[in-house]
Amino acid sequence: LAKRAGLLRRDSVHGSFQGTLRVDEENECIIANGNVIRVIYAEGPDKIDYTTYGINNAIVIDNTGAWSDEEGLSQHLKSKGAARVILTAPGKGNIKNIVAGINHRDIEQDDTVLAAASCTTNAIVPVLKAVNDRYQIVNGHMETVHAYTNDQNLIDNFHKKNRRGRGAPLNMVITETGASSAVTKLLPELDGKLTGNAIRVPTPNVSLVILNLTLNEATTEDELKEFLRTSALYGKLQRQIDFTTSPDIVSSDLVGNRHACIVDGEAIIVKDNRVVLYVWYDNEFGYSCQVVRVVQKMAGIAYPLIPENAQDMGF
């Protein structure tokens, strides 16, 4: 328990915890800024009685990586007090993949198992939707420059995927991404129009997607910048899209950003109807904020957007 609290107290990427932390060994709790976090140990996801801890109708957030299909994730629902499950990864089979701001209204009361898609999908879909709604995308390619993850090896070792076996802190690793196919499930109007690939790089957090798009109509750099800036400030996706024109911004500056993505206005390239967008995202904290937004929707919690009359805006 003390080790878990220590990992929360000091984070190599996100820095020191802002507040107080206390460990209650007797009650198996970590108390963070007065909030009691109960640590529950069990032999399996179906072996917990949440009601013993005063928890009823719980939404279980599964970030174990152990299951991604409905059968595996439904094990949580066998535990007393658990009502619904959300996976922090792409769901397989018939599981609905929900991206806050895009298709959160597809959540129904009888949906017991949902997925929050991937961090990359959450980053690119809001920008693609905004651009497609305004300009109509003819085709495009997305290249993800992704921070390394603990799926990779620290030093060269065996891995089921050849290149990912090489040391993550030492190499740029070309790999694949399922984000392009995931996009078309969320935005069917882009089906067959996008390709995608990925490069894992030796940085611990904050990733970048380069969107190379052909639009149905020509635009200018100034016009596209203003459109994306306005979308970030006042649009339906203002919680998902951020926009920066800082000339010296780099990846580490965006650690802790709460948006699903940040459009780099200074890096936009436009030539007639061909555009290149550089879209940053904190693949840890920014994605976690998106997951929280989905959980809030599942729980029936909603916070207003500004302006107040924006009833149709995203969640």
Task: List PLM regions with ranges.
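C-terminal substrate-binding/catalytic lobe of Rossmann-fold NAD(P)-dependent oxidoreductases
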Residues: L1-Y50, Q136-N139, T144-V275
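Acidic active-site catalytic centers that drive phospho-/nucleotidyl reactions
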Residues: D62, I210, D282
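A broad, structural surface signal
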Residues: K129, D133, S181, D222, ...
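A generic structural signal for alpha-helix starts
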Residues: N122, A218-T219, G286
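N-terminal Rossmann-like NAD(P) cofactor-binding subdomain of oxidoreductases
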Residues: L1-L154, F158-G165, I269, R293-V294, ...
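NAD(P)-dependent Rossmann-like dehydrogenase/reductase catalytic/cofactor-binding core
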Residues: V255-F315
